[in-house]
Amino acid sequence: MKSIVFVALFGLALLAVVCSASEDAHKELLKEVVRAMVVDKTDAVQAEERECRWYLGECSQDGDCCKHLQCHSNYEWCIWDGTFSK
């Protein structure tokens, strides 16, 4: 009878350790996924900052805007410059 109780308690302890390890692995996986999402967003923001400003994007001079756009003097955003060429 004592051995059955010992085996049952040992089994429960082993199950608790396995579940705890599984939960830790799940938390680590979740942290990695969230970290990857945050890194992707910061990379996207940096890429946008390196490129030219699109239509109605904030600017301080014409060189900030993309091709066929110019910086509006009053509102400081990129607007169409009136050209059609490629």
Swiss-Prot record:
Alphabetical list of PROSITE patterns matching this protein = HWTX_1
Per the UniProt entry, the signal peptide is 1-21
Q: Which residues form the propeptide?
A: 22-50
An MF annotation (GO) of this entry:
toxin activity
Keywords, in A-Z order: Disulfide bond, Ion channel impairing toxin, Knottin, Secreted, Signal, Toxin
- The disulfide bonds in this chain are C52-C66, C59-C71, C65-C78
Tissue expression summary: Expressed by the venom gland.
Q: Name one GO cellular component term.
A: extracellular region
Q: Could you tell me where this protein is found in the cell?
A: Secreted
Pfam families tied to this protein:
Toxin_12 (PF07740)
Q: Show the domain comment.
A: The presence of a 'disulfide through disulfide knot' structurally defines this protein as a knottin.
> What family classification does the UniProt entry report for this protein?
Belongs to the neurotoxin 10 (Hwtx-1) family. 17 (Hntx-9) subfamily.
| Function recorded in the entry | Ion channel inhibitor.
Q: What is this protein called?
A: Omega-theraphotoxin-Hhn1d
Origin organism lineage? Eukaryota, Metazoa, Ecdysozoa, Arthropoda, Chelicerata
